[in-house]
Structures are given as C-alpha cells and as structure tokens.
Amino acid sequence: MQAFYLDSEVWSSFDFTRQPSSVILSAEVLAYLDDVDETKRKYFSSTHTWMPIISKMRLNRLTDSAVGKTRVDIALLLLCMKLVPDGVAEDENKPSDLYLTAKQLCATLERNCLLTLRSLQANLLLAVYEVGHAIYPAAALTVGCCVRQGVALGLHNKDAPQLGGNVRSWVDWEERQRG
C-alpha cells in the first residue's frame, strides 16, 4: 500500500487487488450474512432507489462466485447493505449490534490497508446510517473517511493514479462514477 503513495508508477505494475487478505471474518459477521439474497433484495428495493451506488449485476456476480468464501470487503458491504434498511435499534439510546459489528469490521479493513471500491461503498452506507440516526460526531468522521478513500482510489480525477486499477468494463466505470 505504501508503494502507491510513494511511487504510483511502481504501484500500477503491482496487482494489489489479487493479494490475499489476512483478515478473517468472525463468527459474528458470518451470522449476519446468513441470507445474502434477502439482504440484496431489501437493499435494492429500498435504499438503492434513492442512492444507486452499487451495481446489482456486479454484486450478484461477486456473491455468486464467492459461495462459502466471502471476501472481507464484500462482507462489509453486505453488512452495511443490511444495516441501512433494517437498522432500527431496539433501544434508541444504544447503537444496534449490527452497526457496531459493521463499524468494527470497517476499522479492521482500514488497519489492514484493504481499500477497495466495495469498502468505500460500505462506508458511504455507514455514513447514511449514522446521519439518519444522528450518531455524531461519528457521521462526520465517516463522511471524511469516505472522501479520503475516494481520493486514494483516484475517483476525484480520471487522470489521478488509480489505486483500484484500470477500468475493465462499462459496469466498472459506472460504479466508480457513482461511488
């Protein structure tokens, strides 16, 4: 990851996205991912109608190909997709367990230098949840994190070095524009 910030030309020859992640999903995270199809259905019929930042076609492809072996960034995205439509806490003075789990996994990915378009999308959904539930100053900090992730991924300028690699298809391009 440091190579990107020190010399983006060296970085562009290194395929970071295919490197294995050392992050192992906890049993708690896996328990929340029990029904991926239901999570996707609820998200795309609710939140996606007013905030279309995730490609349904791409997400279906990623989740279908990862049966039994979900990547951590996709797991975080699915947690946050579940959080926004279902995110009402039983006790409004205490954050939901799902929110705390998503927030913890987000911090784990950041500590392990795992920055992808999926993790940015998850953070955007996390920010929506925090703003909607008036969780301040966490909401402001998450929005700032989203901005920094977008800049690091090169989404702010098409001529900027692209941490996420080159765009391979129209779906990639469209999703980056919406992210």
Swiss-Prot record:
Pfam families according to UniProt: Fungal_trans
GO molecular function, one term: DNA binding
Keywords tagged on the record: Nucleus, Transcription, Transcription regulation, Virulence
Record CDD domains: fungal_TF_MHR (cd12148)
Keyword Endoplasmic reticulum: no
Gene Ontology cellular-component terms listed: nucleus
Location of this chain's protein in the cell: Nucleus
Biological processes annotated in GO: DNA-templated transcription
Keyword Membrane applies: no
Broad class of where this protein is predominantly found: nucleus
Top-level taxonomic group: Eukaryota
Function of the molecule: Transcription factor that probably coregulates the gene clusters that mediates the biosynthesis of botcinin acid and its botcinin derivatives, acetate-derived polyketides that contribute to virulence when combined with the sesquiterpene botrydial. Botcinin acid and its derivatives have been shown to induce chlorosis and necrosis during host plant infection, but also have antifungal activities.
Protein's name according to its UniProt entry: Transcription factor BOA15
Highest classification ranks of the organism: Eukaryota, Fungi, Dikarya, Ascomycota, Pezizomycotina
Annotated gene: BOA15
